[in-house]
């Protein structure tokens, strides 16, 4: 039976707080093993990659080569259904257009003292994109991670993807070429993260690493952070749907299951003010579950982490939604637009009954790499800015230094930093 929380219950606040603090991931204690892998790749380079790939992915990289060739990508295009390639092109173009609007502008101005100030934006020179292998090897994620980098002007976009038993998803290779990925290497796991961070004989190092992965990949990203930048440590996917009784229960059920089929630890939440509607949605979920190819995954997710929250009215839904801070928030109520300005915490908001979150996954144009596990309270989804950095600009002439220098000297001396004070005073003959 799915968890049901009723706002009218006297212990609702206690139950809701417990619900928010519930853990959906079993943390594997992998840090020691991962650190050993990372250190070995740093020391031994390609030979460590060859060994780990034989051991973990059952592939002989000495025979296949570490790098994926252009001929292999050509073959992937030949193997891919033309209709899927066209759909990926549509997705790419929409992602590109939306993210182009995020490009920041340089700024430079002169203040009242004649001091010139400003900021200049530049792209990161090289980034690494980790793409999981196996069932989580999604071409849409390649587009979502690579296209903002391309729009930002990153010179070198490097993709690593494991090839268990030598197999690569051809659509992942197709998406990589469509998105302008520069290099592709058939390595995965913590060893791939280490290779991107420190470099090997074959793989040149990058400045930032993005993309999802398992506990080993996440641990490796934490370990190499500082040597390189990273995007985020993402958890299981989640959706919160705020819906009134005028919605079709089958539609809402389908949206809940679209998250549930991702992962047994994914979370799907319905928030409504109508108990009869909630029951209708639950019944629709049970009917639809048995039609899915990933029935077992979706069933486990819905059973273990799904929830129905019954509120007194939708005014009460707003603060609760902000506390949940969901990765995906669907608002399917009569005046959905009126809700939007009052939502502070959400990774992405899907407005109205004709905007299922799945459109955002693929072809909406917004990025689907979003903060999970309530981290939307303090972070944002992936964007062009994640592939850029801002440099401050400052220019003074002698007049401006005379105007500002004495205050700088005063503060430096108050902080006990004589050399700081002297750096200004020597120019002013003080």
From Swiss-Prot:
Pathway: Amino-acid biosynthesis; L-histidine biosynthesis; L-histidine from 5-phospho-alpha-D-ribose 1-diphosphate: step 9/9. NAD(+) binds at residues 130, 191, 214. Catalyzes the sequential NAD-dependent oxidations of L-histidinol to L-histidinaldehyde and then to L-histidine. HAMAP family: HisD (MF_01024). Zn(2+) binds at residues 259, 262, 361, 420. Belongs to the histidinol dehydrogenase family. GO terms for molecular function: histidinol dehydrogenase activity; NAD binding; zinc ion binding. Pfam families: Histidinol_dh. Gene3D superfamilies: 1.20.5.1300, Nitrogenase molybdenum iron protein domain. InterPro entries: Ald_DH/histidinol_DH, Histidinol_DH_CS, Histidinol_DH_monofunct, Hstdl_DH. CDD domains: Histidinol_dh. The active site is at 327 (proton acceptor), 328 (proton acceptor). Substrate binds at residues 237, 259, 262, 328, 361, 415, 420. This is Histidinol dehydrogenase. One of its GO terms (cellular component) is cytosol. It is an enzyme of class 1 (oxidoreductase). It comes from Brucella melitensis biotype 1 (strain ATCC 23456 / CCUG 17765 / NCTC 10094 / 16M). Binds 1 zinc ion per subunit. The gene is hisD.
């Amino acid at each position: 039976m799915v968890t049901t929380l009723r706002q009218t219950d006297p212990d609702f606040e206690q139950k809701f707080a417990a619900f928010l603090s519930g853990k959906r991931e079993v943390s594997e204690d992998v840090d020691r093993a991962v650190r050993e892998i990372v250190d070995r790749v740093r020391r031994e380079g390609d030979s460590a990659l060859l060994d780990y790939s034989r051991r973990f992915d059952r592939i002989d990289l000495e025979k296949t080569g570490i790098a994926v060739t252009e001929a292999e990508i050509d073959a992937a295009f030949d193997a891919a259904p033309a209709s899927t390639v066209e759909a990926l092109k549509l997705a790419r173009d929409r992602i590109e257009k939306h993210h182009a609007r995020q490009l920041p502008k340089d700024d430079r101005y002169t203040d009242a003292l004649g001091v010139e100030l400003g900021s200049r934006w530049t792209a990161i020179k090289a980034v690494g994109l980790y793409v999981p292998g196996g069932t989580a090897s999604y071409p849409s994620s390649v587009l979502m991670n690579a296209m903002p980098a391309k729009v930002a002007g990153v010179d070198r976009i490097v993709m690593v993807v494991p090839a268990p038993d030598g197999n690569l998803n051809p659509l992942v290779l197709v998406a990589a070429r469509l998105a302008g990925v520069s290099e592709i290497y058939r390595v995965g796991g913590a060893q791939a993260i280490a290779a991107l961070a420190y470099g090997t004989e074959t793989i040149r190092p990058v400045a930032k690493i993005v993309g999802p992965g398992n506990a080993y990949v996440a641990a490796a990203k934490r370990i190499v952070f500082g040597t390189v930048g990273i995007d985020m440590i993402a958890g299981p996917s989640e959706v919160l749907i705020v819906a009134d009784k005028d919605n079709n229960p089958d539609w809402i059920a389908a949206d809940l299951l679209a998250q549930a089929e991702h992962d047994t630890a994914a979370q799907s939440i319905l928030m409504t003010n109508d108990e009869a509607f909630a029951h209708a949605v639950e019944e629709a979920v049970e009917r639809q579950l048995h039609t899915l190819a990933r029935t077992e995954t979706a069933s486990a997710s819905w059973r273990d982490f799904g929830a129905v929250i019954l509120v007194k009215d939708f005014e009460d839904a707003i603060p609760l939604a902000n506390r949940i801070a969901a990765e995906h928030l669907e608002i399917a109520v009569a005046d959905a637009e009126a809700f939007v300005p009052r939502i502070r915490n959400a990774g992405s908001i899907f407005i109205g009954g004709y905007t299922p979150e799945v459109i955002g996954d693929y072809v909406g144009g917004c990025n689907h790499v979003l903060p999970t596990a309530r981290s939307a309270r303090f972070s944002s989804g992936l964007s062009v800015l994640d592939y850029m950095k801002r440099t401050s600009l400052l220019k003074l002439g002698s007049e401006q230094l005379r105007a500002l220098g004495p205050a700088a000297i005063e503060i430096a001396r108050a902080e006990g930093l004589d050399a700081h004070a002297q750096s200004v005073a020597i120019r002013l003959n003080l």
